[in-house]
C-alpha cells in the first residue's frame, strides 16, 4: 500500500496489475490508480498477454468469476443474494461485482425477445441484440440471469444460467440467443424432487450481475 501511495503521489497515470489466486483488498488501489488489471495466475505466456492489454494491442474482455469484497467483515459475498444492507460505515455492495469487467470499447443491449421453446429440450429462448458503439473492435461477455418468482421453496433473486462471449467490430451488431433447458429452470422442491415448477420467471440480461441492461418475464 505504501508503494501504491508513493507512485500515485507522482501524479503519473497508475495501473496496478494483480497476480493472485484469490481476491485481495483492492480498496486503496481502486482509489489511487487509474486502472486495475487482475491477471490471476496467467501462466508462462501471461506476461505477453498483460503487455498486449497495457499497450492497447488487445481490448480486455475478462469477467470476474467472484465478487471482490470491500472488507473481511463483508465475507462471504454471494452475488445471488442480491444487494445487502449497508452496515455502520460499510456499504452492502461489493467493491467489484461478480461478472464485472471493463473493455476499451462500449456495448449497448437492445431488443429483448422471449419465446417458448420449439424443441422438446428447450423450454424457453431468450434473445437480444448487442451493438459495439465504441471506437474499436472488442469482445463482450453477454450474461443471462434468471430469477424464479413463485417457487415452492426459497430461491435466490438471480442466478447466472448462461453466458456468451462474442467478438464485434466497431459499429457491428449481433443477435445473441440463449436456449433454456430443464436443468436451467429446475429446482429441488421440499421433498427433494428435481422438478421444473410452473410459474413466473424473471429474465435479466447484462454485462455483470450488477449491470443488468434488459429485463423481462415469462410463464411456464
What are these regions, as identified by a protein language model?
Residues 9-14, 33:
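A short helix->loop->beta-strand "cap" motif at the edges of active sites that frequently abuts
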Residues 19-139, 145-147, 198, 202-205:
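Secreted, periplasmic, or luminal enzymes acting at the cell surface/secretory milieu
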Residues 1-4, 14-16, 36, 50:
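Extended, hydrophobic alpha-helical segments in both membrane/secreted and soluble proteins
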Residues 137-144, 156, 189-190:
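Short, hydrophobic/aromatic beta-strand segments
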Residues 181-220:
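Terminal connector regions
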Residues 152-187:
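Intrinsically disordered, low-complexity Pro/Gly/Ser/Thr-rich segments with frequent PxxP/GP/PP motifs
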